[in-house]
C-alpha cells in the first residue's frame, strides 16, 4: 500500500517526492536542508520553530492551554518515541497489525508527532497521542501478514485505521498524507466521524496544484489544510482545492534526520496539518461543552481571511489558535459547516443519514465497532463477510411517524 510521499529532504541534492498515481502519499512535500554540524544531543527547541512564536504558543502554555484531556490520533509512519524532543510525551502506538516503517516513513511520523506533542515546542504538549502506522510500499515499508484480510479491507487501509482510531477514543484525527482512495469504506468512515463528533484534519498536499481527488480533504466534514509562511502568505508548493478549509504554517520546521542525527529545515502541509489539529485540540480543552459542530464553526469564524470569506487556496484563512481559545463557540449554531463543501462533496447529508439509520451494507464498513446493520437484506445474516450485529428491519427510517 502507498505511494510517493509529499516529502522532500535535501541533504546534498534536492529530492522531490510528490504524489503519483497511487494510493497514499505523505503530505509534507517538505524541503529539508542541513542546519550545520549537529549531534545526537542537539535537542530541537521552541527557538528553532518559527511557528511557535508566530502562534504565541508560549502565551498559550502560560495560560494552561496544552491540549490536556484531549486525545489526538495520527495515521502516519512509525513514531520514534526515543527522540529527545518527545521525552515525556503521552504517545501510544495503537497500530492494529504489524507494519515495519522505513527510515523515511519513521522520520515523517516522528516529525508530525513532534509538532503536536514535543515537550518544548509541540502545540499540544499534554495531549494524549495515539499513533497508527500506515505502510508506504514505495518507501520500503512492509505490512505483516496479520494486516491482510481475505474478504474486506486490510487492517492498515485508511478507512480501517480511521475507524480503529475512533474505536480507541480519538477526538481529533490528523492525516498528513494524501489518498486517491474514493471507495465506499472511506466514505462511511468519514460519515461515522461526522455523526460521532470526531474531527478529521487532512493536508491538501504539496504539488502546487488543485489536488482534486488526491486528498482526504475532498470529503464532507474534513478540515482540509494548506500551507502558509510566517508572514501569512500561501506557499507555492501548497496544493489547493474545494476541500481546503484552513491554513497553517508549513515551515520552516526544524526536524531530525534519524540517520545522520543532524537537524534539518523542512516545509510542507504535513506540518501545517497538525498545527490546525492542535489548534482544534486547544479549543476542545478550553470549551469542553462545545459540540464538534460548534468547534468547526469556531475554526471558520476565526480564520484570518477578511470577513472570514472562503477561497480554494487558504479556505477561511490561517488558523488562529489564540482567537479560538478566546472566542466562545456556544454563540454558533450546532450545525456542521462542512457538511456540503464548495462544488458538492460526499458523504452527502442523505448518505450520512443512511449510515446513522444502519442501512449501509456491512460489507462496506471497515472495523467500525459501533455499527449495527438495521436494513432489510436477509442475506446479510450468517454471511461470513458480515462481522456486525444485524437487526433486520429495525432502522428508524422504517418506523418514522
Task: Give each language-model segment a name.
Residues 44-72, 95-101, 320:
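N-terminal domain-start motif of subtilase-like serine proteases
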Residues 61-72, 78-92, 100-152, 220, ...:
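Subtilisin-like serine protease catalytic core
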Residues 71-75, 128-133, 166, 171-176, ...:
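Structural recognition of the beta-strand scaffold that forms the well-ordered cores
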Residues 138-217, 264-267, 271:
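Substrate-binding/access-modulating region of protease and related hydrolase catalytic domains
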Amino acid at each position: 500500500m502507498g505511494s510517493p510521499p509529499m516529502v522532500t529532504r535535501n541533504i546534498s541534492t534536492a529530492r522531490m517526492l510528490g504524489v503519483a498515481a497511487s494510493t497514499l502519499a505523505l503530505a509534507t512535500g517538505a524541503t529539508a536542508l542541513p542546519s550545520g554540524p549537529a549531534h545526537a544531543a542537539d535537542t530541537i527547541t521552541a527557538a528553532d520553530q518559527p511557528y511557535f512564536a508566530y502562534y504565541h504558543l508560549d502565551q498559550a502554555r502560560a495560560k494552561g492551554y496544552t491540549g490536556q484531556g484531549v486525545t489526538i490520533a495520527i495515521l502516519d509512519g512509525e513514531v520514534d518515541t526515543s527522540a529527545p524532543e518527545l521525552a515525556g510525551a503521552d504517545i501510544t502506538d495503537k497500530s492494529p497489525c504489524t507494519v515495519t516503517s522505513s527510515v523515511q516513513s519513521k522520520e515523517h511520523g516522528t516529525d508530525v508527532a513532534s509538532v503536536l506533542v514535543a515537550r518544548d515546542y509541540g502545540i499540544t504538549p499534554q495531549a494524549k497521542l495515539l499513533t497508527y502506522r500506515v505502510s508506504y510500499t514505495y518507501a520500503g515499508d512492509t505490512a505483516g501478514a496479520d494486516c491482510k484480510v481475505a474478504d474486506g479491507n486490510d487492517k492498515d487501509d485508511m478507512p480501517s485505521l480511521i475507524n480503529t482510531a475512533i474505536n480507541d477514543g480519538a477526538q481529533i484525527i490528523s492525516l498528513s498524507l494524501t489518498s486517491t482512495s474514493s471507495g465506499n469504506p472511506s466514505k462511511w468512515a468519514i460519515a461515522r466521524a461526522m455523526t460521532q463528533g470526531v474531527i478529521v484534519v487532512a493536508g491538501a498536499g504539496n504539488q502546487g496544484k488543485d489536488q482534486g481527488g488526491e486528498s482526504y480533504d475532498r470529503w464532507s466534514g474534513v478540515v482540509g489544510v494548506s500551507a502558509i509562511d510566517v508572514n501569512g502568505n500561501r506557499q507555492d508548493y501548497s496544493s489547493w482545492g474545494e476541500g481546503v478549509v484552513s491554513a497553517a504554517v508549513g515551515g520552516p520546521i526544524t526536524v531530525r534526520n534519524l540517520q545522520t542525527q543532524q537537524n534539518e529545515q523542512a516545509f510542507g502541509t504535513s506540518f501545517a496539518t497538525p498545527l490546525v489539529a492542535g489548534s482544534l485540540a486547544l479549543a476542545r480543552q478550553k470549551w469542553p461543552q462545545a459540540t464538534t459542530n460548534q468547534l468547526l464553526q469556531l475554526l471558520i469564524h476565526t480564520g484570518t481571511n477578511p470577513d472570514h470569506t472562503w477561497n480554494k487556496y487558504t479556505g477561511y484563512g490561517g488558523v488562529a489558535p489564540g482567537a479560538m481559545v478566546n472566542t466562545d463557540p456556544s454563540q454558533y449554531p450546532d450545525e456542521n459547516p462542512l457538511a456540503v463543501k464548495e462544488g458538492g462533496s460526499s458523504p452527502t447529508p442523505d448518505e450520512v443519514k443512511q449510515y446513522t439509520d444502519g442501512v449501509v451494507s456491512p460489507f462496506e464498513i471497515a472495523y467500525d465497532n459501533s455499527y449495527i446493520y438495521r436494513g432489510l437484506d436477509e442475506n446479510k445474516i450468517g454471511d461470513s463477510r458480515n462481522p456486525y450485529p444485524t437487526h433486520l428491519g429495525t432502522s428508524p427510517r422504517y418506523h418514522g411517524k
